[in-house]
């Protein structure tokens, strides 16, 4: 036995039916009978996630890139080892020993967080704020009667949930190199540049959430001292290197040599003699040197640097792993409700 379904098929004359009113009733039924009964369970799960984030429990997590110091002396690879401690949205202790072969001739450098200082994990804090806002919206929806208001606010809750999941996976641009301007290093360690800076190098530190883990990135950066490439415009915060790179992008009809010449930079031939001469003349540079500066040079913490060594380590945070699983499950459930609500609302707005 088979059944054929005919959309919008009605008993009796079509003019006796009001499609708009029927669609509104259908959307209202969907809200009252399907979505609202699920809200208490959804609210409970969001509350548990927020409770985990706000917990005062202390988590001590090891930090290591897995290369022993003895082995490191043989293969000359960067190493890091230590412990990071989190309580709620704050890092309350951070103690690591770092070694970069090209920094201070491979000497081990110890970073110990200032006693009594708490470093705010901005992503963590934003997720907590989002979850609080989601809970407020969902509690309002439990008593909402207007169909359009319900659908609109449900959509806002979904946007906040999606953004929370993005924050767990990837840090915002302003928290990573070079836009972060060594924020974590300056916030966590008193007089940090006495430890992380040498005559020719500077160390950079990032501490973010990435792929549901606490991620630490350490960079050994070479200072660019050649003028005018190292100069920073005090008004714009952009370096000469940034300006030339931007001009090369916008004026593709010009050669790099011509652009450099227009900006007062002498381009020398790549011979040994000229290379030696150019190293003593601040404005003179060979074309390969200029290309290297444009390719690798970045403005960082009010100076121009080039990365020469990097370490990336992550440590599993049980709270982040658990919350990520719960939020993804909530997203699947709420996305299904949202799709049905949007489809039903579109019918109700069509006359």
Swiss-Prot record:
Membrane topology: Peripheral membrane protein
Keywords linked to the UniProt accession: Cytoplasm, Endosome, Membrane, Protein transport, Transport
Family matches, as InterPro entries: RAVE2/Rogdi
Pfam families registered for this protein in UniProt: Rogdi_lz
GO process terms (BP): protein transport; regulation of protein-containing complex assembly; vacuolar acidification; vacuolar proton-transporting V-type ATPase complex assembly
Domain of life (superkingdom): Eukaryota
One annotated Gene Ontology cellular component of this protein: RAVE complex
Function: Component of the RAVE complex, which is required for stable assembly of the vacuolar ATPase complex V-ATPase under many conditions. May be required for transport between the early endosome and the late endosome/prevacuolar compartment (PVC).
Additional observations: Present with 2860 molecules/cell in log phase SD medium.
PANTHER family the UniProt entry points to: LEUCINE ZIPPER CONTAINING TRANSCRIPTION FACTOR LZF1, PROTEIN ROGDI HOMOLOG
Quaternary state and interactors: Component of the RAVE complex composed of RAV1, RAV2 and CBF3D/SKP1. Within the complex, it interacts directly with RAV1 and CBF3D. Interacts with the V-ATPase V1 subunits VMA1, VMA2 and VMA8.
Protein name per the record: Regulator of V-ATPase in vacuolar membrane protein 2
Organism in which the protein naturally occurs: Saccharomyces cerevisiae (strain ATCC 204508 / S288c)
Lineage: Eukaryota, Fungi, Dikarya, Ascomycota, Saccharomycotina
């Amino acid at each position: 036995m088979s059944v054929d379904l005919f959309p919008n098929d009605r008993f009796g004359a079509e003019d006796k039916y009001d499609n708009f009113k029927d669609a509104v009733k259908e959307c209202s039924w969907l809200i009252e009978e399907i979505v609202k009964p699920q809200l208490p369970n959804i609210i409970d799960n969001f509350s548990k996630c927020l409770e985990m984030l706000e917990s005062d429990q202390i988590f001590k997590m090891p930090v290591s890139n897995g290369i022993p110091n003895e082995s490191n002396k043989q293969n000359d690879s960067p190493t890091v080892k230590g412990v990071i401690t989190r309580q709620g949205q704050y890092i309350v202790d951070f103690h690591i020993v770092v070694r970069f072969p090209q920094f201070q001739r491979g000497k081990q450098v110890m970073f110990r967080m200032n006693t009594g200082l708490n470093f705010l994990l901005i992503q963590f804090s934003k997720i907590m704020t989002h979850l609080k806002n989601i809970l407020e919206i969902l509690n309002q929806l439990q008593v909402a009667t207007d169909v359009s208001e319900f659908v609109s606010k449900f959509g806002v809750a979904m946007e906040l949930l999606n953004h929370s999941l993005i924050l767990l996976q990837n840090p915002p641009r302003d928290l990573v190199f070079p836009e972060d301007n060594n924020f974590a290093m300056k916030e966590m360690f008193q007089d940090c540049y006495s430890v992380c800076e040498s005559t020719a190098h500077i160390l950079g530190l990032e501490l973010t959430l990435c792929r549901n883990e606490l991620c630490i990135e350490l960079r050994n950066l070479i200072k660019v001292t050649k003028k005018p490439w190292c100069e920073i415009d005090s008004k714009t915060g952009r370096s000469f290197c940034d300006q030339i790179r931007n001009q090369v992008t916008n004026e593709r009809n010009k050669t790099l040599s011509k652009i450099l010449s227009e900006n007062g930079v002498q381009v020398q031939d790549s011979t040994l003699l000229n290379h030696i001469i150019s190293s003593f003349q601040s404005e003179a540079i060979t074309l390969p040197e200029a290309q290297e500066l444009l390719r690798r040079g970045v403005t960082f913490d009010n100076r121009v640097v080039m990365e020469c060594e990097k370490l990336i380590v992550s440590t599993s945070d049980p709270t982040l792993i658990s919350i990520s699983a719960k939020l993804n499950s909530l997203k699947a459930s709420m996305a299904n409700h949202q799709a049905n609500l949007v489809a039903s609302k579109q019918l109700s707005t069509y006359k």
